[in-house]
A protein has these predicted regions:
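A generic structural signal for residues located within well-ordered alpha-helices
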Residues: 14, 52, 116, 186-189, ...
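Short gly/ser/thr-rich secondary-structure transition/capping motifs
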Residues: 52-55, 74-80, 112, 167, ...
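Hydrophobic anchor at the start of a short beta-strand
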Residues: 29-31, 71-72, 165, 259, ...
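Acidic, Mg2+-coordinating active-site environments of NTP-dependent enzymes
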Residues: 67-70, 89-233, 308-312, 317
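Short glycine/serine/threonine-rich phosphate/pyrophosphate-binding segments
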Residues: 14-18, 76, 80-81, 189, ...
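ATP-dependent carboxylate-amine ligase
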Residues: 136-137, 196-220, 224-369
Length: 369
């Protein structure tokens, strides 16, 4: 079974399932391992991890092989790379989406964070003893998106390794994206990255091209909700400043009225990104509703104050109760506006002081009346 690894700060889940769709369109039997769910070919379930621990991974791989899977696409987190959570798993190839500030509570510096991501390229390269030669098709493919943070740096650093490093950019797309229904320039990059790796994996160009038009938003990735609000309402997993800026900018392009952002920042995690998220929302949304997003052991009010420190005089509403915050945006937004509920996406719980209570942004939006 070929195992394909997708790493980067934002976009891993989307690239993973899109690549799986492309390989399936090419007649391959493909499972996947994502933050949201695992698909072994016979069942779908959640592990609670982006990249599960090795014993769980081995069980997943064994079940996939039993089901006749030819391929598995999996998300590879920086934590998993640093901890070698995947053991001696032999990857057939991989892709890098981008690198923006996140997980500095773990990696401490952006340099260490980048090196963890680069280490995945080193792991891919360790499976061959060949010398790095540009364009060598027999080397493990490593598709690198040049559009996002650290893309050029990753391309240059991986280029000295024995890998078939494939540059990908939406500025010079090799596929026609006119039929793509996934909104946002970042999704163009995500789809092109998956397409490049699919082609390197043996999927015919025309097959991948035809599959692009059949992709639909899913799993709280700019997923539109049917609600009683006068505005269009979307749920998205954006939980970094870069992701927040990207998704709000994408929505701006088709919104004639105001763009509303409902968001917070996780507790007991990288606190340095909080004012950056506030700044991103202040610069790309017309109105922000700042709320709680898994405060964990921290004081929600203090997290919100840190977010606000980056917002200047931007218009905002502060409501620590996430349900009330969502309802506030949905009730005040007008026809022609768009509301984007950010941060949790597919998640179905809110963690406060060690207790996880049921909470699904999508369900809360549907309950609004």
């Amino acid at each position: 079974m070929n195992i394909w690894g997708i790493t980067g700060t934002n976009g891993k889940t989307t690239v993973t399932w899109v690549l799986a769709e492309f390989l399936r369109a090419a007649g391959r039997r493909c499972g996947y391992v994502t933050t949201v769910e695992v698909d072994t070919g016979s069942r779908k379930f959640s592990t609670g991890y982006t990249t599960p621990p090795l014993p769980v991974l081995k069980e997943i791989f064994a079940e996939m092989e039993l089901n006749g899977m030819t391929d598995c696409v999996m998300e590879v987190s920086s934590h998993a790379i640093h901890q070698r959570r995947f053991g001696d798993t032999a990857f057939a190839g991989g892709a890098f989406t981008n690198l923006t500030e996140d997980h500095l509570d773990y990696h401490k510096t952006m340099e260490a964070y980048f090196d963890a991501k680069l280490d995945f390229a080193r792991i891919l390269a360790s499976g061959t003893s060949a010398s790095p030669v540009a364009g060598r098709r027999d080397l493990p493919p490593y598709a690198v998106c040049l559009d996002g943070g650290a893309g050029v740096e990753m391309y240059e650093a991986a280029g000295v390794l024995p890998l078939n490093v494939i540059p990908v950019t939406a500025r010079k797309p090799r596929f026609d994206l006119s039929g793509l229904t996934l909104a946002g320039d970042y999704n163009k990059s995500n789809v092109l990255l998956a397409a490049a790796l699919a082609e390197a994996a043996g999927a015919p160009h025309d097959t991948v091209q035809n599959a692009i038009a059949h992709l639909r938003p899913r799993w709280g990735r700019l997923e539109e909700m049917e609600t009683a609000s006068r505005a269009r309402v979307f749920v998205d997993y954006a939980h970094t400043d870069d992701a927040l800026r990207n998704v709000l900018s994408a929505v701006r392009k088709f919104t004639p009225g105001k763009v509303w952002a409902v968001f917070g920042s996780g507790g007991d995690r990288d606190a340095m990104k909080r004012p950056l998220m506030g700044k991103a929302a202040a610069e790309t949304a017309d109105v922000s509703v700042v709320t709680s997003d898994n405060p964990r052991s921290e004081d929600p009010g203090e997290i919100i104050r840190q977010i606000e420190s980056g917002m200047g005089s931007a218009e905002r509403i502060v409501e620590p109760d996430r349900r009330k915050a969502i309802f506030a945006a949905l009730s005040r937004a007008a026809s022609g506006d768009s509301v984007v509920v950010c941060g949790k996406g597919h998640e179905t719980t809110q963690e406060t002081k060690g207790v996880k209570l049921p909470f699904d942004d999508r369900q809360v939006c549907r309950e609004f009346c």
